[in-house]
């Protein structure tokens, strides 16, 4: 890493899948790294590299990147949803990133839903629970497999319920999807909108802009903009 770090680097921004203390750069519980408990990441890296370091949740970095450099740059109130091994969100209100007191404002996957939570039904766990993977289901759907298409339709219904929950809580102008599952949006979009017909405020759904992020490395761009 020392060969990659050039003398003209002015700052470092890092997004981690964890609740963090953004002001002090403390990482509390990184998903997938059990040993990372209350790691003072900002202090460690600033001592090593001698430049300011900014640490935030990875979904917040995604939202910051999308709102500054991507599809949401024209909107003030945006919720950016990362669909992958889990599901989380970054929230922009009035053009500013909203993190909550402990940077956990977007932990929507942990909200109870049906018999489990939204993460079980709106991430790759949905497909694993049905004996496949998101990648395999996507490839089968591309080939026209009826079973795979039906699976994505079911998934889209759950995403529609997730969007409804976001509308009730935040009433954003736009929702932008990202993550490894977002590229399959074309397979679950219709079912999502079918579910949204149940939302009681039709005008809200009509004016809501829903899309997928297309900017490459948008999370890295967001991390670079952290303050």
Name every feature range the model reports, one short phrase each.
Residues 53-58:
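General beta-strand structural signal in soluble alpha/beta enzymes
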Residues 15-16, 29, 83:
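A secondary-structure boundary/capping signal
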Residues 73-124:
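Glycine-rich phosphate-binding loop of actin/hexokinase-like ATP-binding domains
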Residues 2-13, 20-26, 43-51, 66-77, ...:
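ATP-binding/phosphotransfer module of carbohydrate and carboxylate kinases, centering on a glycine-rich
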Residues 18-21, 91-93:
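Conserved hydrophobic "DFG−1" position in protein kinase catalytic cores
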Residues 25-38:
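A charged helix-plus-loop insertion that forms the helical arch/lid used to bind
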Residues 29-32, 97, 193-195:
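Glycine-rich, phosphate-binding/catalytic loops in enzymes
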Residues 59-63:
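Active-site-adjacent loop/helix segments that line or gate small-molecule/cofactor pockets in enzymes
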């Amino acid at each position: 890493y020392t060969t990659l770090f050039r003398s003209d680097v002015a700052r470092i921004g890092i997004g981690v899948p964890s609740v963090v203390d953004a002001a002090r750069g403390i990482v509390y519980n990184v998903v997938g790294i059990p040993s990372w408990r209350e790691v003072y990441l900002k202090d460690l890296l600033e001592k090593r590299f001698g430049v300011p370091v900014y640490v935030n949740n990875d979904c917040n970095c995604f939202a910051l990147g999308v709102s500054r450099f991507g599809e949401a740059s024209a909107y003030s109130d945006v919720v950016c949803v990362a669909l992958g091994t889990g599901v989380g969100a970054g929230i922009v209100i009035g053009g500013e990133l909203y993190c909550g007191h402990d940077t956990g404002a977007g932990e929507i996957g942990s909200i109870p839903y049906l018999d489990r939570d939204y993460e079980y039904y709106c991430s790759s766990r949905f497909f694993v629970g049905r004996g496949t993977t998101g990648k395999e289901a996507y490839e089968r759907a591309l080939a026209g497999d009826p079973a795979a298409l039906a699976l994505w339709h079911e998934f889209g219904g759950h995403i529609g319920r997730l969007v409804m929950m976001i509308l009730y809580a935040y009433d954003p102008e736009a929702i932008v999807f990202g993550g490894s599952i977002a590229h399959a949006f074309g397979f679950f979009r219709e079912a999502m909108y079918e579910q949204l017909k149940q939302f009681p405020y039709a005008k809200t759904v009509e004016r809501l802009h829903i899309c997928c992020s297309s900017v490459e490395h948008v999370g890295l761009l967001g991390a670079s903009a952290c303050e």
